[in-house]
Amino acid sequence: MRIDEERLKPYRKMTDAQRNIRSAGDPEFTQQVLDHYMLGENLKGIEVPFNAYKHRFRLKPEELTVLGGINGAGKSLLASQMILHAGEQGYKSLSISMEMSPKAQLARMNRQASLQAEPLVDSISAFGEWAKDKIYFYDQHGSVDPNTLVSIIRYAADNYGIKLVLVDSLMTMSMASDDWNGQKAVVNALANCARNLGVHVILVAHAKKGEKVTDRLDK
């Protein structure tokens, strides 16, 4: 489905001020506290695809995770694996990548899912059938302004039931690379968006590259 400006308009008007003042006796709050004591904080959220972290780290609702590192460190690859693992748990994901087309992302996901460098035709068809209601892409290349980014996430959460959002990357926002205040505003906007919608947002952020991989990363 193409998302035109008319569809996005109501989502642009939403502000953080629209969050309701709610009673301490709100049934949703009560259920959250029950879950906290009965299940434990570490058991809430989307599992990551590593057994060693199964009971130590989750992609929790209302939170933002920043994947930082130099170019070629595998940030996008890891995020792709997290999306696949989320799908296996029944969570729907949205990938907003200004750096890779949906075709390129799907080609990589097919390799990851099949464990084959060149997946077979049947494997690709089976993956498409499996992923059709689990993984969604925002099909735009180049850059996107922060307001449109937040509007897209709100729209996807409302219309597709998205629970995990990948934004790849911070450097593809419509701003100068040294606009630190602008980058801070984007991170804050995504964190607020995650909290308001009850989704988890993964933000890929590139660090300045040193001479060696072991060099300390600049801010």
What are these regions (language model features)?
Residues 69-71, 81-82, 97-100, 139-141, ...:
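Active-site proximal loops enriched in glycine and acidic residues that flank catalytic Cys/His/Asp
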